[in-house]
Design a protein with these regions (language model features):
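Acidic anion/phosphate-binding donor-loop and adjacent secondary structure
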Residues: 66-69, 148-151, 168-186
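A conserved, positively charged/aromatic
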Residues: 105, 111-142, 148, 156-158
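An amphipathic, basic-hydrophobic alpha-helix
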Residues: 52-53, 63-88, 98-106, 127-134
């Protein structure tokens, strides 16, 4: 049975982070459930693994925080939304979320955001910039902690009719199979050189 639902995800780059792999997984899950799947991104390592027969990939400089490019991206997104008759636009980062907000307002499409982490909000301008992530029709929080963080720090931007979902991160059990054993020559040391604590963590 075919579906008329077409979902466009917008993310700065498709790297190997949590937001990026989540975007990748959802993009390939949607076609298996009779939905059309689209991604707008500027690039990234995961692009080469995208199944182009299932997912329509469009390149735009949505990684940029330049206000002019954010505005121009919104114009391109309007064209994409209308041309492909997109039903839902899902933004996973702040700069592209501003482009998506304008594009969905003008095209009257549903707008979803996923709040992946605690953004730095020192100063009113920075907090306003971050607030785009709670200006959507549906806000997805990646954990109960993020849900509480949104309610505590962005209440002035939240309307009473805002809809929230808390969706916890999962793993692909087919890929991370506990029964799979690595041979000794396949085992590699794990580096912890990039391990950092969140800025809001207090010891």
């Amino acid at each position: 049975m075919s579906s008329n639902i077409k979902v466009l995800q917008v993310i700065p780059k498709l790297g190997y982070g949590g937001a990026e792999t989540g975007c990748y997984d959802i993009a390939h899950y949607l076609p298996e459930n009779n939905c059309k799947s689209f991604i707008v991104t500027s690039g990234g390592e995961l692009i080469k693994f995208i199944n182009k027969e299932k997912v329509k990939l469009i390149r735009l400089p949505v990684h940029s925080k330049n206000p002019l490019l954010i505005f121009l991206n919104s114009i391109f997104l309007i064209g994409i939304i209308l041309f492909f008759n997109i039903s839902i636009v899902h933004a996973r980062s702040r700069a592209p979320a501003w482009s998506c907000l304008l594009a969905t307002k003008l095209t009257r499409r549903k707008f979803v955001t996923t709040f992946h982490g605690t953004y730095n909000f020192n100063g009113k301008f920075k907090k306003f910039y971050n607030s785009v992530m709670v200006r959507s029709d549906l806000i997805i929080a990646g954990s109960n902690f993020i849900f509480s963080h949104i309610k505590e720090n962005y209440s002035e931007f939240l309307k009473t009719d805002k809809k929230f979902l808390v969706i916890f991160r999962g793993i692909n059990v087919d890929y991370f199979d506990q029964s799979t054993k690595l041979e000794d020559d396949e085992k590699k040391p794990v580096s912890y050189t990039h391990l950092t604590l969140p800025t809001t963590y207090h010891v």
